[in-house]
């Protein structure tokens, strides 16, 4: 019997919480324009309790997790009783096209996650492992673009009675078929031109889920005309507020950032983002401390301190709690030098 099967046959595994991840598979990659342009892996996670959900992770997050696990469970860890053979993470690649690199990593990262989730239960219960596979509020707000490696999910629903309340039916999201559509699998909905399809969900930008004549399935948006769309959803875009100071004027600009509000960026990524947005290279990044004085950001540690100090402060919805104050690199008059 394989090690993973032995572990799952033991009572320790049965006593794990239902929300512990037991399998994970990469469904797609997507480009994100966060503090810097990058690709994320869209990962379908399955839990012991049978739940499924999607999470979005960068390679650097895999690397950070592996580093922590090596400290705790590697051959040189202080807790030798908990040491185990950790899976190998594919190495960093420093040169190449980002999308091609991400695509090439998928098989190795899938194998990495499979091996990781087959380790002893104390690894599965490790705080950083659980956080890595946990669906954060940011993850849950994302709308997957394609999920090329998974079929779009569907669900069973009760059929809508033709004798049902006609007012309720007319208020429901619905679409009219423009063309005949015959699905390639039982997951896909068949309909004829002119059919009115009641909409259940938006799978992604190209596919919808709906029901017609008691059947439920997915279908391409291009085959229908929307008669009544879904209610408008809250825009999931987060914004970084920047105060830009020139010699005689200052301006405020909010930059759209596809990152979790709780994330901590790297200084080089913030510099790249602001230089691109303000079309200036000779700038310095700052934040205001508790006394209201400007403090220049010189390292990743400074950025982490800025983020920590902003936690708990009141902030607007979709706006990072910390703000950037952008000054000219050689202008030191903006700093308070009084003791």
From Swiss-Prot:
Domain SH3: 170-229
Matching SUPFAM superfamilies: CAD & PB1 domains, PX domain, SH3-domain
Top-rank taxon, per record: Eukaryota
Residue sites binding a 1,2-diacyl-sn-glycero-3-phospho-(1D-myo-inositol-3-phosphate) per the record: 58-60, 92-94
Membrane topology annotation: Peripheral membrane protein
Outcome (variant: residue 154 to A): Reduces phosphorylation
PTM-bearing positions, type Phosphoserine: 315
Domain PB1 residues, every copy: 237-329
Main location: cytoplasm
Expression by tissue: Expression is restricted to hematopoietic cells.
Phosphothreonine sites (modified residues): 154
Matching InterPro entries: NADPH_Oxidase/PX-Domain (IPR051228), p40phox (IPR000919), p40phox_SH3 (IPR035541), PB1-like (IPR053793), PB1_dom (IPR000270), PB1_P40 (IPR034853), PX_dom (IPR001683), PX_dom_sf (IPR036871)
Domain PX span(s) in chain numbering: 19-140
Keyword field contains Repeat: no
GO CC annotation terms, alphabetical: cytoplasm; cytosol; endosome membrane; membrane; NADPH oxidase complex; phagolysosome; plasma membrane
Keyword list, A-Z: Chronic granulomatous disease, Cytoplasm, Disease variant, Endosome, Lipid-binding, Membrane, Phosphoprotein, SH3 domain
UniProt-recorded Gene Ontology molecular function terms: phosphatidylinositol-3-phosphate binding; superoxide-generating NADPH oxidase activator activity
A GO biological-process term: phagocytosis
Consequence the record notes for mutating residue 94 to A: Slightly reduces interaction with membranes enriched in phosphatidylinositol 3-phosphate
Functional description taken from the UniProt entry: Subunit of the phagocyte NADPH oxidase complex that mediates the transfer of electrons from cytosolic NADPH to O2 to produce the superoxide anion (O2(-)). In the activated complex, electrons are first transferred from NADPH to flavin adenine dinucleotide (FAD) and subsequently transferred via two heme molecules to molecular oxygen, producing superoxide through an outer-sphere reaction.
Subunit note: Component of the phagocyte NADPH oxidase complex composed of an obligatory core heterodimer formed by the membrane proteins CYBA and CYBB and the cytosolic regulatory subunits NCF1/p47-phox, NCF2/p67-phox, NCF4/p40-phox and the small GTPase RAC1 or RAC2. Part of a cytosolic complex composed at least by NCF1, NCF2 and NCF4. Interacts with NCF2 and NCF1. The NCF2-NCF4 complex interacts with GBP7 (via GB1/RHD3-type G domain).
Pathological condition linked to this protein in its record: Granulomatous disease, chronic, autosomal recessive, 3: A form of chronic granulomatous disease, a primary immunodeficiency characterized by severe recurrent bacterial and fungal infections, along with manifestations of chronic granulomatous inflammation. It results from an impaired ability of phagocytes to mount a burst of reactive oxygen species in response to pathogens.
Entry comment, domain topic: The PB1 domain mediates the association with NCF2/p67-PHOX.
Protein's recorded name: Neutrophil cytosol factor 4
Organism: Homo sapiens
Lineage of producing organism: Eukaryota, Metazoa, Chordata, Craniata, Vertebrata
């Amino acid at each position: 019997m394989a090690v993973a099967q032995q572990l799952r046959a033991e009572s320790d595994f049965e006593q794990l919480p239902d929300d512990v991840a037991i399998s994970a598979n990469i469904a797609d990659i997507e480009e994100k324009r966060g503090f810097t342009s990058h690709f994320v892996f869209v990962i379908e996670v399955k839990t012991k309790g049978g739940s499924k959900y999607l999470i979005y992770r960068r390679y650097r997050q895999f690397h950070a997790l592996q580093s922590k696990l090596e400290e705790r469970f590697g051959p040189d860890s202080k807790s030798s009783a908990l040491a185990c053979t950790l899976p190998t993470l594919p190495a960093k690649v420093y040169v190449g096209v980002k999308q091609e690199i991400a695509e090439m990593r998928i098989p190795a990262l899938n194998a990495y996650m499979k091996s990781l989730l087959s380790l002893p239960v104390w690894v599965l219960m490790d705080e950083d492992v659980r956080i890595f596979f946990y669906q954060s509020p940011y993850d849950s707000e994302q709308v997957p673009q394609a999920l090329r490696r998974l079929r779009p999910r569907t669900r069973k629903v009760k059929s809508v009675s033709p004798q049902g309340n006609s007012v309720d039916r007319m208020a429901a999201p619905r679409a009219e078929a423009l063309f005949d559509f015959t699905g390639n699998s039982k997951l896909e909905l068949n309909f004829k031109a002119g059919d009115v399809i009641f909409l259940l969900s938006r799978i992604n930008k190209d596919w919808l889920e709906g029901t017609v004549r008691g059947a439920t399935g997915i279908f391409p948006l291009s085959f229908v005309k929307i008669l009544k769309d879904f209610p408008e959803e809250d825009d999931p875009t987060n914004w970084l507020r920047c105060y830009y100071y020139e010699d005689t004027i200052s301006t405020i600009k909010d930059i759209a950032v596809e990152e979790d509000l709780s994330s901590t960026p790297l200084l080089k990524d913030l510099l790249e983002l602001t230089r691109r947005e303000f079309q200036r290279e000779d700038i310095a990044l700052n934040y205001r401390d508790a006394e209201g004085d400007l403090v220049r950001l010189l390292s990743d540690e400074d950025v982490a301190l800025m983020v920590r100090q902003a936690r708990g402060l009141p902030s607007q919805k979709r706006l990072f709690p910390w703000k950037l104050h952008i000054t000219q690199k050689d202008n030191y008059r903006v700093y308070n030098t009084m003791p």
